[in-house]
Design a protein with these regions (language model features):
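Short glycine-rich, Thr/Ser-proximal phosphate-binding strand/loop in the N-terminal lobe
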Residues: 3, 12-57
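Glycine-rich beta-strand-to-loop/alpha-helix junction loops that act as flexible
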Residues: 8-9, 84-88, 200-202, 314, ...
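Short beta-strand-loop/turn "lid" adjacent to the catalytic site in phosphate-handling enzymes
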Residues: 71-116, 137, 143-152
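General beta-strand structural signal in soluble alpha/beta enzymes
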Residues: 83, 114-118, 135-140, 146, ...
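Glycine-rich phosphate-binding loop of actin/hexokinase-like ATP-binding domains
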Residues: 144-247
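Catalytic phosphate/nucleotide-handling subdomain of diverse soluble enzymes
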Residues: 210, 215-251, 257, 321-353
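Adenine-nucleotide phosphate-binding core of ATP-dependent small-molecule kinases
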Residues: 257, 264-268, 275-310
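Internal helix-turn-beta structural module
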Residues: 290, 294-315, 324-392
Length: 392
């Protein structure tokens, strides 16, 4: 089945056309600077070089329209379309074939992720209008986490407030964490029972997964909560918001921008949110960059402890996403903190585990299997499309 996977961000849109049977990628690309008259469109086919051009992208409809226009020039067929949706709210515990009711629910929960859901909904609507005969499937970042017990997802706020505004922990990166479990289980079999999935990138989260069921995760009502990230602060004292507004005169929007776009690795390093840039400067002795990496590893380790406790133990740890897949030093710093749990990594395997598919990096005799598993959210989305539509 040939599935077009669409991943619409707040100001960007990525896509990939792949065959679910062979995993062959026929075409892929991206639209950048959506909302601008100086957008950038990139497209490549069959693993060839990406061709780019400047295109005005006033909104997400214009972006997906350009993608479909380009794909229509090829001989590739599209059998279904899968859409990554950041927030499914309280409505969805699985992916869903899009109809009018599903669209209404996506828009209903959009205030929980206003920078994403509205753009994603616009892309879906255009695809439904353009190809009414094709199935569209919404794959939610949050649905995997809907198995969390009430004690894990409930906030200690007045119940009437939480009920009225649907305030609770929803989590994110669910499609990636689901892939990590699937691959770890496929490789390790019965040895994989309690998994700590570490999605460490510009956005970062952990998930505690027991027998395929999410028990807890670090992101909360929004993806701002939890770990320190590229530009997000992660968990801080909530009163910090009130304090900055009261004493600093900051508006709500200024504080929101600060915590989402000006914090994390960028704020501590003072140079970049890109871990590669920070690692280079840290190796040269830059104290702020050294602190940024130490904080990133420390905060991930500290929250990992709570994830492990929620499962009453751990037998498998996986690392994925940009930092998790490519930065051996972060993996080592993280795992060294859990030597008391019997975690041991093989330093040579850890250093070499870059870009070669799933790899075990734990040492012989380690009580916990540690792996690097490159995530593939597009694969998961495409197979959800196949699973939900192929027999219809």
């Amino acid at each position: 089945m040939n599935v077009l996977v669409v991943n619409a961000g707040s100001s960007s849109l990525k896509y990939q056309l792949l065959d679910t049977d062979t995993c062959e990628v026929f075409a892929k690309g991206n639209c950048e600077r959506i909302g601008s008259d100086m957008g950038i469109f990139g497209h490549s086919e069959n693993g060839g070089a990406k061709q780019t051009e400047e295109v005005p992208f006033p909104d997400h409809r214009s972006a997906i329209a350009r993608v479909l226009e380009e794909l229509e020039k090829t001989d590739f067929t599209i059998d279904g379309i899968g859409h990554r949706i950041v927030q499914g709210g309280w409505h969805f515990d699985d992916s869903a074939v899009v109809d009018d009711e599903v669209m209404a629910k996506i828009l209903e929960v959009a205030p929980l992720a206003p920078l994403h859901n509205y753009g994603e909904a616009a892309a879906i609507e255009y695809c439904r209008e353009k190809y009414p005969e094709l199935p569209n499937v919404a794959v939610f970042d949050t649905s995997f986490h809907m198995t969390m017990p009430e004690v894990a997802y409930t906030y200690a706020l007045p119940k009437d407030v939480c009920d009225k505004y649907h305030v609770r922990k929803y989590g994110a990166h669910g499609t990636s964490h689901r892939y990590e479990w699937m691959m770890a289980k496929e490789i390790l079999g019965s040895r994989c029972h309690r998994l700590l999935s570490c999605h460490l990138g510009n956005g970062a989260s952990l998930a505690a997964i027991e027998d395929g069921v999410c028990r807890d995760t670090t992101m909360g009502l929004t993806p701002l909560d939890g770990l320190m990230m590229g530009t997000r602060c992660g968990s801080i004292d909530p009163a910090t918001v009130c304090y900055l507004q009261r004493e600093g005169g900051y508006s709500y929007q200024e504080v929101d921008d600060m915590m989402n776009k000006q914090s994390g690795l960028l704020a501590i390093s003072g140079i970049s949110n890109d871990a590669r840039d920070i690692r280079t400067r840290a190796s040269e002795g830059d104290e702020r960059c050294l602190l940024a990496f130490d904080m990133f590893a420390y905060k991930a380790m500290r929250q990992a402890g709570s994830m492990i406790a929620s499962m009453a133990g751990v037998d498998t740890i996986t690392f994925t996403a940009g930092i998790g897949e490519n930065d051996w030093s972060i993996r080592k710093a993280f795992c060294d903190c859990f030597e008391w749990l019997g975690v041991r990594i093989d330093n040579n395997k850890n250093r070499e585990a870059v870009g070669n598919g799933p790899q075990v990096i734990s040492a012989a005799g380690s009580a916990v299997t540690v792996m690097v598993i490159p995530t593939d959210e597009e694969y998961m989305i495409a197979h959800d499309v196949e699973r939900l539509t192929k027999n219809n």
